[in-house]
Amino acid sequence: MTETKPNRHVKTVCTLGPASSSPEIIRKLLSGGMDISRLNLNYGTLEEHSQLIKIVRSVSQDLKLTTGILLDLPGSKRRTGDIKAVFADHLEFAVSHQADFIALSFISSAQQVKEVRRLLTEMKSDIPIIVKIERAKSLEAS
């Protein structure tokens, strides 16, 4: 991702949703300093998110700014079982839309993050993963 503001080491992340999905609002957010657009895939449809990504990229291009796309993957608070079954469609969406970052919440072990990385590698993607640590147990090595 290209630096959008010289000498800035902090990035402003804005969560976009129904109230902030118009080109006009996105233009205001970008002009106000938004560096990364966060889309929470827990809400809305993949088609709605696809359209929003197109709008963000179009407005960013008009303003000659580079804006990152962060896709926050949905997940249950009690994540167990097959990671591939939980994330496959959303990871494919992230890869096909060239997301700049993927966020994971409610991860219960380092192994789950490794599995997501393995799935991304299979898809020939190296999208950075941001993990939200909910419990101390999640930090334990697997």
Residue positions per predicted region:
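Non-catalytic helical/linker scaffolds that mediate oligomerization, partner binding
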Residues: 1-142
